[in-house]
Amino acid sequence: MVGLIEFLAHNLVDEPESVEVRPIRDDRYATVVGLRVAESDLGKVIGRQGRVVRGLRALVKAAATRKGTRVDLDVV
């Protein structure tokens, strides 16, 4: 799942070397994955009224559900 998030984030931002994806918390119900990008790219990842980040979260949840797990995405 981290690979999918990294791929999507790298293609959204201007500074792909600043993209950092790592699991924040992993309990028996869900894994929370944190996405960190450069300050200048934060608006691109969030999007207008949060549309881009909502789309990212939907893709990640769909991929996780397909694998039988639950993953939540946080932009840190």
Model-derived segments and their meaning:
Residues 46-50:
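Glycine-centered tight-turn and secondary-structure capping sites
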Residues 1-42, 55-76:
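RNA-contacting regions in translation and RNA-metabolism proteins
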